[in-house]
Swiss-Prot record:
Residues 1-27, 276-312 are annotated as: Disordered. It is found in: Cytoplasm; Nucleus, Nucleoplasm. There is a cross-link at Q212, Q213 (Isoglutamyl lysine isopeptide (Gln-Lys) (interchain with K-312)). Its main location: cytoplasm. This is Loricrin. There is a cross-link at K312 (Isoglutamyl lysine isopeptide (Lys-Gln) (interchain with Q-213)). It comes from Homo sapiens.
Length: 312
């Protein structure tokens, strides 16, 4: 009597989600400029919203970058227009409405990033408001925080605990999760490793952070916010956010001066280089065209066949 173990039917590898290339390009007045992580499209709102979307939960959020933390999309709240729900797809358009508020931003003006946290930011081009904490007020603040949830499939980086970023910076650029007001405050960024290099006060914020590579654990495009960028541009400008992975923090030099863009760079390469001053901005914009290329980020499962038992 012969026994032969049935081989499992080989399954195709997990489909990689390829982020849409291009993007970049701030639109709107004052240049919102936010590129997308993973190279997605951007599209800025007016009054400089510098934001991108948060990792895991794919969705675009275009200029508004609202980026919801963790899985599901859903446009940002608080004026964040674009962003369609989805699992790992970036949808191009979107764009922020009005002052280009970032997702989860209850404040006016362009608020920058996406945070899963509560406090909205108020004031022009504020960056992110970390979870739990109050938003930043005044000029551009730097980073983005993902409260709690964070990006799907990876550890939350750049997250503030209990409101680490209490006030954000007022006036000039602030670092991400900056605690305390005044010009650029050092980012009190927790988690991840590299912090932001403190934001610069006034003028153009230079400090960008080194990014941190995060182990991919799902097939979703996951920009790892290994180090928030401090950054923050001059008045009104939101800082750039650098994501980990490929691009590192290059290109996110310091946000722009003027109402302005804050660029972010994608995990696959920089999407915006430095942000532009004034009008168009962000994204890989020079003139608002995006050069960021989408990169497929995912894990392909390796198939193993069960051994075939010899006939007896």
């Amino acid at each position: 009597m012969s026994y032969q173990k049935k081989q499992p039917t080989p399954q195709p590898p997990v489909d990689c989600v390829k982020t849409s290339g291009g993007g970049g390009g701030g639109g709107g007045s004052g240049g919102g400029g936010c590129g997308f992580f993973g190279g997605g499209g951007s599209g800025g709102g007016s009054s400089g919203s510098g934001c991108g979307y948060s990792g895991g939960g794919g969705y675009s959020g275009g200029g508004c970058g609202g980026g919801s933390s963790g899985g599901g999309g859903g446009g940002g709240i608080g004026g964040c227009g674009g962003g369609s729900g989805g699992s790992v797809k970036y949808s191009g358009g979107g764009g922020s409405s009005g002052g280009g508020s970032g997702c989860f931003s209850s404040g006016g003006g362009g608020s920058g990033c996406f945070s899963s946290g509560g406090g909205g930011s108020s004031g022009g081009g504020s960056g992110c408001f970390s979870s739990g904490g109050g938003g930043s007020s005044g000029g551009g603040s730097g980073c983005f925080s993902s409260g709690g949830g964070g990006f799907s499939g990876q550890a939350v980086q750049c997250q503030s605990y209990g409101g680490v970023s209490s006030g954000g910076s007022s006036g000039g650029g602030s670092g991400c999760f900056s605690s305390g007001g005044g010009g650029g405050s050092v980012c009190g960024y927790s988690g991840g490793g590299s912090g932001c290099g403190g934001g610069s006060s006034g003028g153009s914020g230079s400090g960008y952070v080194s990014s941190q590579q995060v182990t991919q654990t799902s097939c979703a495009p996951q920009p790892s916010y290994g180090g928030g960028s401090s950054g923050g541009g001059g008045s009104g400008g939101s800082g750039c956010f650098s994501s980990g992975g490929g691009g590192g923090s290059s290109g996110c030099g310091g946000g722009s001066s003027g109402i302005g863009s804050g660029c972010i760079i994608s995990g696959g390469g920089s999407v915006c280089g430095g942000g532009s001053s004034g009008g168009g901005g962000g994204g890989s914009s020079v003139g608002g065209s995006g050069s960021g290329k989408g990169v497929p980020i995912c894990h392909q499962t390796q198939q193993k066949q069960a051994p075939t038992w010899p006939s007896k």
